[in-house]
Amino acid sequence: MKKILAAMLLILIVILAAGAGYQWWSSGNGNKKQFQKSQEIFGNPLMGYAPSAWYENVSEDISLLYMDITWAELEPEEGVYAWDSIEEENQINRWKKEGKHLILRFVCDIPGDEKHMDIPRWLYEKTGEDGTWYDGEYGKGYSPDYNNKVFIEEHEKAIKALGEHFGKDGLISYIELGSLGHWGEWHVNYSEGITRIPEEAVRNQYIMPWLEAFPGVNRLMRRPFHIAEAYGMGLYNDMTG
């Protein structure tokens, strides 16, 4: 009987507290705001199309810009990171002053018009030059062997360095998980003899370093792999229309 009375008393206290809270809120002490219909066009913060961070002119309502960094740009010499040139090209100081935010994608292979690599020469040599040079439908370039254990180890170090440099001040709002495949989009044109993207166990080794390096940042994937759901990641697409 005592337990029943105690439970009833607790319920009564909760009801009275809720009623008092509602009375306080409805009396005008709460934080209320009434919006009016408008035909005005206004920006949607941190959403939608993001212009490149190197653009000189962006509209005032833009709050989000896009920055990609190739491994060749990031680490031209082993353990030496080219922060100054990266920040200058992407106008980092400007965007910080203007209160903008960035999307970051790390890329190891961007097809182009001429033969080239988007990983540094030292890494190419350290991994035994075991990737694939290609010249096909997408363009020309070099596709690393993403199963290479040395490549995976060095990738983890590079992501850690990115997190230590860019992951402390809130500038980066989104990470587009790149690293693998053409344009960092987790696919390759294997019909031209390029080694396929690795199986799940290896792919995940390219994901976990990002979770540790940028713990408070929204993360996006190009493909709906299982791990995206497990860690609450969104999806991105470079196309419109």
State the predicted function of each range.
Residues 91-96, 100-102, 125-176, 200-213:
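An active-site-proximal structural segment forming one wall of the substrate-binding cleft
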Residues 30-147:
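N-terminal substrate-binding region of glycoside hydrolase catalytic domains
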Residues 23-29, 158:
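N-terminal membrane-anchoring alpha-helices
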Residues 69-73, 78, 106-110, 170, ...:
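Short, flexible loop/turn elements at secondary-structure junctions
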Residues 31-54, 61-66, 96-100, 174-183, ...:
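Catalytic-core regions of glycoside hydrolase
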Residues 1-13:
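N-terminal Sec-pathway targeting helices
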Residues 14-24:
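Hydrophobic alpha-helical membrane-insertion segments, chiefly the h-region
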